[in-house]
UniProtKB/Swiss-Prot annotation:
This is NADH-ubiquinone oxidoreductase chain 1. It is found in: Mitochondrion inner membrane. Belongs to the complex I subunit 1 family. One of its GO terms (molecular function) is NADH dehydrogenase (ubiquinone) activity. It is a multi-pass membrane protein. The chain crosses the membrane at residues 4-24, 70-90, 106-126, 154-174, 177-197, 224-244, 278-298, 316-336. It catalyses: a ubiquinone + NADH + 5 H(+)(in) = a ubiquinol + NAD(+) + 4 H(+)(out). The lineage of its organism: Eukaryota, Fungi, Dikarya, Ascomycota, Pezizomycotina. It comes from Trichophyton rubrum. It comes from the Eukaryota. The keyword Cytoplasm does not apply. Its main location: mitochondrion. It is an enzyme of class 7 (translocase). Core subunit of the mitochondrial membrane respiratory chain NADH dehydrogenase (Complex I) that is believed to belong to the minimal assembly required for catalysis. Complex I functions in the transfer of electrons from NADH to the respiratory chain. The immediate electron acceptor for the enzyme is believed to be ubiquinone.
Length: 343
């Protein structure tokens, strides 16, 4: 019983991420409106800041109409599975120095596992709807996720080779001298492309291509189930993948400025722990917000590509490049270490 309560408590601790998702939808709309030279949402609340809550209330109050021949249980279960596994990844993220929900040595492996399991929710939702558009969208999404998850694992393998650890806190602390984005800049660019494809975002949103599949695997979902699928699960995955990118390549909660501002004044006698944790969390938030902005920027700038082009780029261009890096980079590092020892 105690174990069950502990598991439920740790899961509930991930729910504040849903509030971040609400404001992310607002910021995306306002950013895209600015890029397209229009006003965007500005009616509900001050400067339109309550628009996401109004949309959520509208979807909650709508009647849910399920397809006649659909498997109702799996149709409901698919979005819920996707949302649960999208939120579970937040448990192992170090939000600051000593500020985390759970910290264990296989943190990055845990995130890869739960992100892979979210694919089953998409597959269930598409198959159980008894609709050709939803089924084709779920098949596309599954093929796309499997392909680009393979790439992400190779990219993360390089970071593990640099640090020798699967612990996210250790990976962050290993970047005190230099962020990994500098020696691994080409890897980071390809990794970020893989992250966009992993989250089904434009220009890789082929699983829900409106011109081909209506709304893909979400075609037959409406009301609160659509809100779980689109507003919550998808945007929670975007925030999680941006946090993971900042942890792996941008130093996570490490200070953005070259100066160690934590030691500018003596805070040992007054709120030292709270101040340091707050500053470190702010650093992570700024880096994550920048990556989310790049997500939105890419969506507003590039048209959707064809599905065969997406898969071809993955298997014929990006995968050979990353395999070459995985083989050559350790050889270069070992060679440099040997030459230094000889000197």
């Amino acid at each position: 019983m105690y174990t069950l309560i502990s598991i439920i408590g740790k899961y509930i601790s991930c729910l504040p991420a849903l509030l971040i998702v609400a404001f992310l939808t607002i910021s995306e709309r306002k950013t895209m409106a600015s890029m397209q030279r229009r006003l965007g949402q500005n009616i509900v609340g001050y400067y339109g800041l309550l628009q996401a809550f109004a949309d959520a209330l509208k979807l909650l109050l709508k009647e849910y109409v399920a397809p006649t021949q659909a498997n109702i249980i799996l149709l409901f279960l698919g979005p819920i599975i996707t949302l649960i596994f999208s939120l579970l990844g937040y448990r192992v993220i170090p939000y600051g120095s000593g500020l985390f929900i759970s910290d264990f040595n296989l943190g990055i492996l845990y995130i890869l596992a739960v992100s892979s399991l979210a694919t089953y929710g998409i597959l269930l939702a598409g198959w159980s709807a008894n609709s050709k558009y939803a089924f084709l969208g779920s098949l596309r999404s599954t093929a796309q996720l499997i392909s680009y998850e393979l790439l992400l694992r190779f990219y993360i393998l390089l970071v593990i080779l640099f640090t020798g650890s699967l612990n996210l806190t250790t990976i962050i602390e290993s970047q005190k001298v230099v962020y990994f984005i500098l020696p691994l800049l080409p890897i980071f660019l390809i990794f970020f492309i893989g992250c966009i494809a992993e989250t089904n975002r434009a220009p890789f949103d082929l699983a829900e291509a409106e011109s081909e599949l209506v709304s893909g695997f979400m075609t037959e979902h409406s009301a609160v189930i659509f809100m779980i699928f689109f507003f919550l699960a998808q945007y929670a995955s975007i925030v999680l993948i941006c946090i993971l990118s900042s942890v792996l390549f941008l130093g996570g909660y490490l200070n953005i400025l070259p100066l160690n501002t934590y030691n500018v004044c003596d805070f040992n006698s007054l709120f030292s722990d709270y101040l340091i944790n707050g500053l470190s969390s702010l650093n992570l938030a700024i880096k994550t917000a920048f990556l989310i902005f790049v997500f939105i920027w890419v969506r507003a700038s590039f048209p959707r590509i064809r599905f065969d082009q997406l898969m071809s780029v993955c298997w014929t261009i990006l995968l050979p490049i990353i395999i070459a890096y995985v083989v050559l980079l350790p050889c270069i590092v070992i060679g440099l270490n040997s030459s230094i020892l000889l000197i």
